[in-house]
Amino acid sequence: MSTNTTSKRTTTATQGRSQEISRPVARKAGWGDLDVRAVDTARLLAADAVQKVGNGHPGTAMSLAPVAYLLQQNVMTHDPSDPAWLGRDRFVLSCGHSSLTLYVQLFLGGYGLELKDLKSLRTWGSQTPGHPEVHPT
């Protein structure tokens, strides 16, 4: 653990991550510890999925994790028990390289994706192709 006192703000870094710098936005948004842990989990799932397959683009999925989580949990109208519901909001991500952002949120949101699906990212016949498709996922 190290302390940085060179700036106006004193930060304590734990495992390379500053707690002081990483939490203020979450606090302003009214997020609790569970929300922060969910976003951290989404980031780790994205990194792990790309590591497992050996190629891909984890950066965008990791950086979009807070936005995607906020939309999925607090903004979008949807029902995991009825994914074909006509009245649901749709999450359209024009950046196909970040399909992993969508897959992680579907996994965390209870839409039927399992950890094994994330682990089979970008493999032939998987539920999680490298670029989003209409029916597999």
Question: PLM features: residue spans?
Answer:
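Conserved N-terminal diphosphate/IPP-binding helix and adjacent helical/loop segment
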Residues: 29-45
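Cofactor-binding active-site loop characterized by glycine-rich and histidine/acidic residues
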Residues: 32, 63-137
